[in-house]
Amino acid sequence: GRQAIFRDPSWNGGDYYGGKKPEDGLGLARMIGHITYMSERLMHEKFGRRLQNADLFGFNFESEFMVESYLHHQGIKFVNRFDANSYLYITKAIDYFDLKADYGSLAAAFEKVTADFLIISYTSDWLYPSEQAREIVRALRACGKHVGYTEIESDTGHDTFLLDDRQTQRNIANFLRSQFEKHG
């Protein structure tokens, strides 16, 4: 995704304020990223190999498939509400972040934390797999922390938490209620 922004001539080394923004690069970065936000099953159900506005292949370079049109739409929406440099810094910060690095282990990183935790994962999330969530839960429990964990069976991928997901809402509401009862 970052390379798409870097290769946009309007990026200008990040100094595009006051000029044309690198909308093509940012839109393409969003399109690339968006593919990982949905599960394979949801992508297949929603789009499959269906064509957008035709019954037969056009054998050209236009956006023929529904998935192409959807991804273009997502890219256009994104550039209207997000800044390319912000995208670059956020994604780079995610790459650099390693909680274990400064502490030697996850358990050591959580040792001094006094808060209770609620960890929720989704079976179809490719970006934050359930196994990573379970690793965090094991580390929290290893250092005696109170942690609730729920793995939600879902076919909607990383975006599940953005959708109308009653199970996620219920888990968060119950956790917050318990925290209010505990702490007032």
Specify the residue positions occupied by each region the protein language model found.
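Catalytic active-site module of serine/aspartate enzymes centered on a nucleophile-bearing elbow/loop
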Residues: 134-184
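Short, conserved loop/helix-junction motifs that constitute active-site signature segments
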Residues: 110-114, 141-143
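Short alpha-helix in the alpha/beta-hydrolase fold that links the catalytic acid
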Residues: 102-107, 129-140
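Long, compositionally biased charged/polar accessory segments in the mid-to-C-terminal portions
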Residues: 83-85, 89-90
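Active-site nucleophile elbow and catalytic-triad environment of alpha/beta-hydrolase enzymes
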Residues: 73-74, 90-109
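Alpha/beta-hydrolase-fold enzymes
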Residues: 1-77
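Acidic catalytic loop of the alpha/beta-hydrolase fold
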Residues: 77, 96-97, 123-128
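Short beta-strand/loop motif that positions the catalytic acidic residue
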Residues: 113, 119-121
